[in-house]
A protein has these predicted regions:
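Single, function-defining residue in the core of a domain
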Residues: 1, 15-22, 27-31, 46-47, ...
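DNA-recognition alpha helix
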Residues: 1-9
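Glycine/small-residue-rich loop that forms an oxyanion/phosphate-binding "nest" at active or ligand-binding sites
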Residues: 32, 36-38
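Conserved beta-strand elements of the Class I
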Residues: 49-51
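Short, positively charged patches
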Residues: 69-72
């Protein structure tokens, strides 16, 4: 018998780059979504997904022709290019769910958050975020989408806090509040700062117009002392007190740190800090690809841990915390 062996010649770097340019980064987004659907997360908190939202800056290859990603480093005094990643992360299942990539100059974390919330398919989700996401618009968007939120706000004494004009006690509390948002400036509105909050035309709020001049916002505020400290933390949420106690609100917020740890793993363990591409669309492909790799790693680790070992001791994976 005569065997014909055909030599396989690998594609050149140029050919690979040209082939990548034909693929949209949305394909990778689709793959991530399908992966999460194929292996639905099973760790829930009282039936809810706990989803942290946060942002992280990512340095990318310098390109002076792209002003949206170009900025000057304050510490180093030189020009750099950077993306800002707005990410949602399932903290109980170690799973990336979504991301919105923005140029460093067009960064808008608040808008990115409510877009991510509205794109999430399940209503049984609690979105957890830090103080930079605490706006009336964020709260209204999440409520309108039928989801739940738990956001840390600046404390009652801060001049820029959402809570500053309410007559609140300087102690731990768990209270229901409501406020009417408006762009009108009548004497009646000005005389009732606890009932009304005036929004200037420069303040972004998407639910007031000429047909709907007012918007009533209902929410809950939980204030508690930090462990071993005299300082207070304040949390705003639309979660019911009948379903979630004050201590559970505190516990849920503390899970947010999982997303901070995930950024470290994504950038260094999954090597996102060393992208190969220079084109902005190709870099976004790599961002989604690293998230897919991250999720696959934790899905595999989760199944290994849950599998009953035949031997005496339980096997543990170094991938799981």
């Amino acid at each position: 018998l005569i065997f014909s062996i055909t030599q396989i010649i690998p594609p050149t770097a140029s050919a690979l780059v040209q082939a990548r340019s034909k693929i949209s980064s949305r394909v990778f987004q689709y793959i991530l979504n399908e992966l999460n659907k194929a292996f639905p997360p099973d760790n829930l908190y009282k039936g809810y997904h706990l989803i942290a939202v946060d942002g992280s800056e990512m340095q990318i290859p310098l390109d002076f022709s792209d002003p949206d990603t170009l900025h000057k480093s304050a510490s180093k005094g030189k020009f750099l290019s950077a993306f800002h990643l707005n990410v949602s992360y399932d903290v109980l299942n170690h799973r990336y769910l979504d991301t919105i990539v923005q140029g460093i100059h067009s960064k808008n974390e608040v808008e990115a958050m409510w877009k991510i919330v509205e794109r999430f398919h399940d209503d049984n989700a609690i979105f957890i975020a830090d103080r930079n996401y605490a706006t009336w618009n964020t709260m209204a968007h999440i409520i309108q989408s039928g989801k739940s939120f738990l956001i840390r706000v600046k404390d009652i004494h801060s001049i820029s806090s959402l809570l500053r004009k309410f007559n609140l006690p300087d102690e731990e509390f768990d209270l229901d509040l409501h406020i009417t948002l408006t762009r009108k400036q009548t004497k009646d509105i000005k005389s009732q700062p606890e009932k009304y909050r005036f929004l200037s035309t420069t303040s972004t709020f998407d639910f007031i117009d000429e047909h709907n001049p007012e918007y009533v916002l209902h929410f809950r505020v939980v204030r508690f002392k930090l462990d071993g400290s005299e300082e207070y933390e304040s949390i705003i949420t639309n979660l019911s007190r009948d379903e979630f106690s004050k201590d559970e609100i505190k516990e849920i917020y503390n899970t947010r740190w999982g997303i901070e740890l995930s950024f470290r793993d994504l950038k260094f363990s999954a090597d996102l800090c060393a992208v190969h591409a220079k084109k902005r669309e190709s870099i976004q492909q790599e961002i989604w690809a690293r998230m897919i790799l991250y999720n696959i790693s934790f899905i595999m680790a989760h199944h290994i841990i849950n599998k009953k070992p035949k031997g005496k001791g339980k096997k543990k994976s170094i991938l799981m915390r």
